[in-house]
A protein has these predicted regions:
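Transmembrane helix-loop-helix hairpins at the membrane interface
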Residues: 56-68, 83-178
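Short linear motifs at secondary-structure transitions and domain/linker junctions
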Residues: 12-14, 26-28, 65-73, 105, ...
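Structural signal for the C-terminal ends of transmembrane alpha-helices
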Residues: 24-34, 155-158
């Protein structure tokens, strides 16, 4: 069976799963509880909802002014086999954000926040670095992502658990992938 773009879309699932696996393995080897290592806990519902609404507004306003999302063209979805659509959404909209947030707002934020840089430095470094890993985007889009990274970092600091930035990032990518 020949499915166009299967390999590329399969990698969108495999790579985040590998990153998540490495984070989990590192926590187990170092015997660190998830709450300590990456801030895994249930966030305060009202605060998480507030951050999600703020982030949704950032997404919509930034897209209104920069039109980074592009046109609402569903041709690619109609023409692709269902497995490709499932892999694309799973990889880009769910697993990718989980992996990136575990690394940036989980491990890196947690480590930098405990240094002389403090929380502000941790938020700035993770936001700028996260924007930089999207180097294939336009400079304006990278700047937009750095701003998004600051919001993700602020949400991590204000609500404590990493779940809030993960949900925010998933929201962004769901909007972007469609």
């Amino acid at each position: 069976m020949n499915i166009p773009h299967l390999g590329a879309n399969l990698m969108k699932v495999v790579m985040p799963l590998l990153a998540i696996g490495v984070v989990v393995l590192a926590m187990r080897v170092r015997r660190l509880p998830a709450a300590t290592a990456i801030g895994w806990a249930k966030p305060p519902p009202a605060a998480a909802a507030g951050w999600l609404l703020l982030y949704a507004a950032y997404i919509l306003v930034s897209n209104y002014f920069m039109f980074w999302r592009g046109p609402w063209d569903f041709t690619i979805w109609r023409e692709a086999p269902l497995i490709i659509d499932i892999l694309r959404v799973l990889g880009v909209a769910v697993l990718g954000p989980i992996a990136e947030e575990l690394i940036f707002r989980g491990i890196l934020y947690g480590r930098f926040a405990q240094t002389k840089l403090g929380v502000g430095g941790a938020i700035a470094i993770t936001a700028i670095t996260w924007g930089a890993i999207h180097y294939t985007y336009t400079p304006g889009e990278i700047l937009l992502l750095v701003g998004a990274g600051f919001l993700l970092g602020l949400a991590r600091w204000q609500t404590r658990p990493i779940v809030t930035p993960i949900l925010m990032h998933i929201l962004w990518n769901i909007y972007a992938v469609w």
